Every structure is written in structure tokens, then in C-alpha cells.
Amino acid sequence: ARRGRASAYAGLAGFNMFSILNSLQNDLAAPNSSAVFFQAAKKITDLDNMNKAVEDMALLSAPTKDDLLFRSLLASVTAAKTIIVKYDTNMNSKLDNPDQVNFTTNDKKIKSWEELYSHLGSAASPYSLERAYIELADAFDGRGTSWKTISPFASVTKSGSYTQANFNTIEAVGDFGRRIKTANIKYGNSVGEFKAAILELDGVN
């Protein structure tokens, strides 16, 4: 029931797992970059419904591989949409220099950077890119070439068998997480350094 309700919420927000996965894996420019999730986030029309879907999927007691695939992609696209809603102040669906990025941008609208970083970095959080990376690696493990995966925040190492396309998608989550980590290092240094790191989150700059 929770998977069905989560799918409904996500669908209302514009998220279809198969079309999202197809677009992620057919991005010829940078299939292993955070950019793919920001491209996918352009299709999302309602962040609140994405958040509801993430919360519902987190409550599954015995998730299948399909569930892990769904919720890891869901969390990654939700993270990208959250970043866009918070920092794309000129509302052109991308992170660029005209955006008014500072240490407190849209803190009342979206969580503060500290809260957001905790959400995206902690494996205990359903919104976490760390968790999404680990669960996506588990979901895709099974066929293809043997690869080693290293999670972006806690450096959890695993070995698995993946097709090149699937490994690229796992690494895209890793790239997103590493960019978030870099932004957090810059946070508090100077507004200029932090803004530069935020603008690089979508992998376009």
C-alpha cells in the first residue's frame, strides 16, 4: 500500500521511474554526473508530493530491489529539485551566476543549509544521497562487470556486478554527494566560495 501511495504522490509530481531512468541513462553528455538528476528535476512540478513519496517509501519494512531502485532515484531527484527550489532565485530552472546565493538563501522556504546537508548526508535520512548511493548499488547488483563502489559521505565500500549504464547512474549519485560535501566545506568560508560550489551542484557550470 505504501509503495502504491508513494508512486501516486510521485506521479502527481511528475516522477515516473522508468522514464526518469531512461533519461538518466541516455544522457550522452555526462551520464555519471549530478547533472542528470537536475535534468530530471526539470520534469518535477511539486516538491511537496515528492517529499511525501520519499517519506512513504522510507516506511517499507522489507524493500525489494525494485523498491530500492525506486526510492534511491526518487531521493536523488528530490534532492536536485530541493536545491533548485532553494537556490535558483531567478527561477530559470538552473543554477547560474544571477542567482542570489548566500548562507541564508530561502531558509524560510526550504531548510537551512545545515539542515539540508544533514538530510542529504546522513544514511539515516530517507532523503540522503549516501543512502541512495548504497541502495542503488544494491538494486543494480547482479549482472555485468565487477565494480567497486565507494559511497560519497561515509566511504562505505562494496563490490558488485553492474552494466556500464547502471554503474554510471550509481556514480552520478556519488558525484552529486561529493559536490554537496564540497559545498559544505565552503559554507562559512566566504559567500563567494559557497556560491561557486552551489552553482557547480548541477554539473553544468
What are these regions (language model features)?
Residues 3-11, 73, 77-78:
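"A position-specific structural signal for the A-helix of alpha-solenoid helical repeats
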Residues 10-64, 80-199:
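Short coil/linker segments at helix-helix boundaries
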Residues 63-69, 73:
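Long alpha-helical scaffold regions
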Residues 201-205:
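Extended, compositionally biased alpha-helical segments that mediate assembly or anchoring
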